[in-house]
Amino acid sequence: MRQLLPGDTVWRNIRLATMDPQRQAPYGLVDNQALIVREGHICDIVPETQLPVSGDNIHDMQGRLVTPGLIDCHTHLVFAGNRAAEWEQRLNGASYQHISAQGGGINATVSATRACAEETLYLLARERMMRLASEGVTLLEIKSGYGLELATEEKLLRVAAKLAAENAIDISPTLLAAHATPAEYRDDPDGYITLVCETMIPQLWQKGLFDAVDLFCESVGFNVAQSERVLQTAKALGIPVKGHVEQLSLLGGAQLVSRYQGLSADHIEYLDEAGVAAMRDGGTVGVLLPGAFYFLRETQRPPVELLRRYQVPVAVASDFNPGTSPFCSLHLAMNMACVQFGLTSEEAWAGVTRHAARALGRQATHGQLRADYRADFVVWDAEQPVEVVYEPGRNPLYQRVYRGQIS
């Protein structure tokens, strides 16, 4: 009989979808095993027969499915206002590029966010965060990028820090100052990039407000040369990088980010084979964002077969934002990734667990159920993982465990 220490907690009578690639079964499924949690981490996974059937801190889950906590590795959670009017314009025929050129798009949200009080931004973001937590999300990336000036970018990152301090969900904050050219720099995008590189990145990094630097390399964002300046600045300071690339056109952004060993290349609808090869060589995760593809009514799909062939890890994220993916649901993103992009259910699950963890640099501690990993997991009223993906309007969450505590 396995000896338990005081304070150990056990989940038994469960189906474990470990998402551990070392296990041969789909989803890393194992039956007749129990999960032992100690001090916020998974201590061990052991046969049921090694443990008592009942006792203090032993939870009988009556055969329910247990998976790692979900990870949303790409969100723009902190913002004010909405862009419903722009969506109506698009329904009437206007393009995303046209709306952006007219001062809409990202800059419309920038104006609303700059004017919004920090406490109001916090309350708005907290409600969104709790919606994701209610779906089983235990690790969440939050980007800045709706300030486009030092003071407001810092304000957004402070909100992310305040959310993290609640200890309800892990937050991975990202500086996305190179999101768009603000109105005051409309005729001088290079000057704005200088501000980002010489002021925003070093000052906000020194304050410990973010974990990685992101950028938008696109015709409506920044060109390759401007993007590389951002990457060079970040890497000189030892900051991990990532990029929004190849969403609306092929500029070579994925190759660029991969040359700097980027954590991830996100969107990637127009990614070509050279870009896929570069991502493999750079250890860069491909992050699929089907919500934006759907909402913008795009037709160019990411090259999923190429990503498989080159064995590039593929993550899936909500891309929750007010302009192009107003979907605060990772379950929906998983379903969309399967229906629109052709992922299997198992690939979608890997995309919101172990591959999403890799996209945030957390692959050694998050995204799998195995010894020494964080005890972040979800108990579902389901028998098979596909059930969560299949019916996104229904939330079968039974219990969410964060750092070993039922939350």
Swiss-Prot record:
Keywords attached to this entry: Cytoplasm, Histidine metabolism, Hydrolase, Iron, Metal-binding, Zinc
Pathway: Amino-acid degradation; L-histidine degradation into L-glutamate; N-formimidoyl-L-glutamate from L-histidine: step 3/3
Broad class of where this protein is predominantly found: cytoplasm
Compartment list: Cytoplasm
A Pfam family per the record: Amidohydro_1
One Gene Ontology term from the biological process aspect of the record: L-histidine catabolic process to glutamate and formate
InterPro entries according to UniProt: Amidohydro-rel, HutI, Metal-dep_hydrolase_composite, Metal_Hydrolase
Binding, Fe(3+): 74, 76, 244, 319
Keyword ATP-binding on entry: no
Catalytic activity: 4-imidazolone-5-propanoate + H2O = N-formimidoyl-L-glutamate
Residues annotated to bind N-formimidoyl-L-glutamate: 146, 321, 323
Cofactor(s) it depends on: Zn(2+); Fe(3+)
Residues that bind Zn(2+): 74, 76, 244, 319
Gene Ontology molecular-function annotations: imidazolonepropionase activity; iron ion binding; zinc ion binding
Family, similarity comment: Belongs to the metallo-dependent hydrolases superfamily. HutI family.
Role: Catalyzes the hydrolytic cleavage of the carbon-nitrogen bond in imidazolone-5-propanoate to yield N-formimidoyl-L-glutamate. It is the third step in the universal histidine degradation pathway.
Name of this chain's protein: Imidazolonepropionase
Organism for this UniProt entry: Salmonella dublin (strain CT_02021853)
Designated gene of the protein: hutI
